[in-house]
Amino acid sequence: MSVPVSQIPSLKAKGVIMRRNANYHPNIWGDRFINYVPVDKMNHTCHLQAIEELKDAVRRELLTATGLSQLNLIDAIQRLGVGYHFERELEEALQHVYHKNHYHDDTEDNLYSISLRFRLLRQHGYYVSCDILNKFKDEKDNFKESLTTDVPGMLSLYEAAHPGVHGEDILDEAIAFTTTHLKSLAIDHLRNPSLASQVIHALRQPLHRGVPRLENRRYISIYQDEVSHNKALVKLFKLDFNLVQSLHKKELSEISRWWKELDLANKLPFARDRLVECYFWIIGVYYEPQYSLARKILTKTIAMGSIIDDIYDVYGTPEELNLFTDAIERWDASCMDQLPEYMQIFYEALLDLYNEIEKEIAKEGWSYRVHYAKEAMKILARGYHDESKWFHNNYIPTMEEYMHVALVTSGYTMLTTSSFLGMDNIVTKETFDWVFSGPKIIRASGTIARLMDDVKSHKFEQERGHAASAVECYMEQHGVSEQEVCKEFYQQVGNAWKDINQDFLKPTDVPMTILMRVLNLARVIDVVYKEGDGYTHVGKVMKENVASLLIDPIPV
C-alpha cells in the first residue's frame, strides 16, 4: 500500500497539496533476487567443457546437413536460442540456401518446407518473393482447402506470413486462412496434444513477435519430444540455458543491491517498484552473455525512466514539473536546490547513475555515448511534460498532435539509445546519429509500444486521472466507439510491424545486430501488453514468465 502523501517530508512545510494516487501494488518479489549463490567452480568448468564439445558436434552436423534436414536444424538452433554460438555457420548456410534452389525434389516442395525456408530467410534479412506461395492457391485465387489437412504445413505457413511487408497481400491472406482453420483444428480435431499445444500457443503468440528467451524455454519441451530431434542440440540447449540463467541471476542480484541501496521504493512510494520486471524486459532485448554490461546499464535506465513517468503522470504538480523539466534539461547538480525534496532525491540518483555509466564505459573508450543517452532522456522528459500540461488543462489533442508527442513518451527512442551504451564496438557515433534521425523502424517500434499500451491501460489511467490516451483522442476526433478505435489501432500496429520487417531486409542502413534491439523492444511490448498492462499490474502471466527465465532451471 502506498505511503500517504502527508508522510513525504517535502510536503509538510507547504501544507496539503492535492495529488493523484495511482495506488500501484508494491514489489511482489521482495528481496528474493538479492542473494545470489554462485555456481560451483568445478561444475561450471565441467559445463563449459561439455558445451564446447556439444557445440563442435552441432557444428559438424550443421555443416553436413542438406535440404530440409538443414533447414530444420537451422530452425531448431535458432528457436532454442543457441544461435549466437554459430553465427558465422548459420549465415553461410542461409546464404547458400538463398543462392541455391534446393527444391527440385518433390518431397521437399511442400507447404511446410517452402514456408520454413521463406521464414528463415526473411528473418535473416533475405528478400524472398511471396509469389512462391501462389502454387498453393486454386483457380479462384484462394488457398486450397486441401491444405487444411496438413497441420504442420499450416502452422509453418502461419509463422512464415508474419515477417511480411507492405503490399504482400498473399501473406495477409495466409494469416487469415491459417488462423481460421488452425483455431478450428485446435478445438475440434487435433488428437496430438503436442501439436495442439503448438497451434494454440502460435495463435496467441506468433513466433516472430515473441520474446526470444521465452520462446527458447518453451520450445525445448516440444523439440525434445520430436522423434528426429538432435540429441547434441538438446543437451547443448539445457546446459547453455542454465549457465546463462546463472549469469542473469548474478546480474539481477547486483542490480537489486543497487536498487535497495537507493531505497527509492520507500522514498518515492507513489512510483511503481518494478525492478525485476524491468530486468525481464531487458532480457527480452538481449539475453546473450556478451551483452551483460549492456543489460545492467539498460535495466537501471528503464527503472529510472519508469519513476520519471510516474512523477509526471501521477505525483508532480504543474509548478513542480516545470522545475523538474528545467532541471533535467540543464542536467546539473546545481539545479537541486530549486526542486522539492522528493524530486531532489530522484534527481541526485539520476545524475549519479549517468556518472556511474560514463565511468564504466570510459574504460572501453565509449564516453561519447553518454551524451546521446542524456539527450534522449531530456527529450523524454519534455514529452512527459507536454502530456502533463494536456491533463492539467483538460485538453484533448488531435491524433496527429498526440502521436507526435506519444512516440516520444512511449520511451522507446530513449530505450533504443540506451540499449547501445554497453554494447561492443559495432556501435559507433553514426549509430546514435541514426537513432536521432528518427528512422522508420524506431518510429514503428514506438507506435507499437504506444498503441498497445494505450489500448490495454487507458481505462485504469482515466479512472485515476491521466492525460487523454490515443483511445480518447481518436474517439473525440472521429466520433467512433471504443471497439472501433481498438480495431483501427490493431490495424496500425500490424502496419508498424510491416515497417519493422521492411527495414530488416538487406541491404540495411545499420548492422543487423543494431536493428535486432529495436525489433526485440517491439517484441517485449507485444508480450507484456498482450492481455493487459503486465508491467504496472503484475499478474499470473508475468510471474510465470519471470519464474521461467530467472528462477527455474531446465532439468538436465
UniProtKB/Swiss-Prot annotation:
GO terms for biological process: diterpenoid biosynthetic process; sesquiterpene biosynthetic process. It is an enzyme of class 4 (lyase). Mg(2+) 1 binds at D309, D313. It catalyses: (2E,6E)-farnesyl diphosphate = alpha-humulene + diphosphate; (2E,6E)-farnesyl diphosphate = alpha-selinene + diphosphate; (2E,6E)-farnesyl diphosphate = delta-cadinene + diphosphate; (2E,6E)-farnesyl diphosphate = (1S,2S,4R)-beta-elemene + diphosphate. Gene3D superfamilies: Farnesyl Diphosphate Synthase (1.10.600.10), Terpene synthase, N-terminal domain (1.50.10.130). Its cofactor is Mg(2+); Mn(2+). Pfam families: Terpene_synth, Terpene_synth_C. It comes from the Eukaryota. Sesquiterpene synthase involved in the biosynthesis of volatile compounds known for their medicinal efficacy for treating enteritis, dysentery, itch and some cancers. Mediates the conversion of (2E,6E)-farnesyl diphosphate (FPP) into beta-elemene, alpha-humulene, delta-cadinene and alpha-selinene. This is Sesquiterpene synthase 2. It comes from Toona sinensis. The lineage of its organism: Eukaryota, Viridiplantae, Streptophyta, Embryophyta, Tracheophyta.
